[in-house]
């Protein structure tokens, strides 16, 4: 675990620091919700506890939708550039930080790829910890 990580949104108007994150718990999610939320083939996230998060979350835009499980998913984004910062999945109670917002990602090890039936692009060769094109 690192003592401190920092990150920001795309436009830089929202900055944060986080005292600890689960460096070995990072994963890539290939579900349709994560693909749509990021506009990409998958979302790269890392679990964290909101108590360790330092930043004025009241300025973030909260976007809520029903996930594949029909439970609420809350995504918190910069209100200026709409860059996604973190997600709260109510079904599991999990809080996940989008790793792309971190200033330094060199210590993060992805533990797995979470893929679902018809939930990933066929051109991606996905194993548990590796993605190849």
Language model region names:
Residues 1-8, 13-133:
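A short Gly-Trp-Pro
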């Amino acid at each position: 675990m690192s003592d401190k990580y920092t990150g920001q949104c795309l436009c830089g108007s929202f900055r944060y620091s986080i005292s600890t994150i689960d460096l070995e718990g990072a994963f890539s999610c290939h579900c349709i919700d994560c693909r749509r939320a990021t506009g990409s083939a998958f979302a790269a996230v890392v679990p964290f506890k909101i108590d360790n998060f330092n930043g004025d979350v009241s300025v973030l835009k909260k976007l809520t939708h029903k996930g594949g499980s029909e439970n609420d998913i809350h995504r918190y984004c910069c209100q200026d550039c709409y860059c996604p910062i973190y997600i709260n999945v109510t079904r599991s109670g999990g809080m996940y930080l989008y790793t792309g917002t971190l200033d330094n990602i060199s210590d993060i090890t992805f533990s797995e790829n979470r893929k679902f039936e018809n939930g990933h692009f066929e051109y991606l060769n996905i194993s548990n910890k590796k993605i190849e094109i």
